[in-house]
């Protein structure tokens, strides 16, 4: 999982990527291609 300062490009890497807020952090999850998972500080 990458830790990025901005998730704008991370959500556009794959069309299945979606942004989720969990416990005050912002995550990008991608079920079809999990290598695109990322988290914002």
UniProtKB/Swiss-Prot annotation:
Transcription listed as a keyword: no
GO cellular component labels: ribonucleoprotein complex; ribosome
PANTHER family: 50S RIBOSOMAL PROTEIN L36 2 (PTHR47781), LARGE RIBOSOMAL SUBUNIT PROTEIN BL36B (PTHR47781:SF1)
Name of the featured protein: Large ribosomal subunit protein bL36
Annotated organism of origin: Neisseria gonorrhoeae (strain ATCC 700825 / FA 1090)
Similarity comment text for this entry: Belongs to the bacterial ribosomal protein bL36 family.
Pfam families: Ribosomal_L36 (PF00444)
An example Gene Ontology molecular-function term: structural constituent of ribosome
Keywords: Ribonucleoprotein, Ribosomal protein
BP-aspect Gene Ontology terms: translation
Top-level taxon: Bacteria
């Amino acid at each position: 999982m990458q830790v990025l300062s901005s998730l704008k490009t991370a959500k556009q890497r794959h069309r299945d990527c979606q942004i989720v807020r969990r416990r005050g952090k912002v995550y990008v999850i991608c079920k079809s291609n999990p290598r695109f998972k990322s988290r914002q500080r």
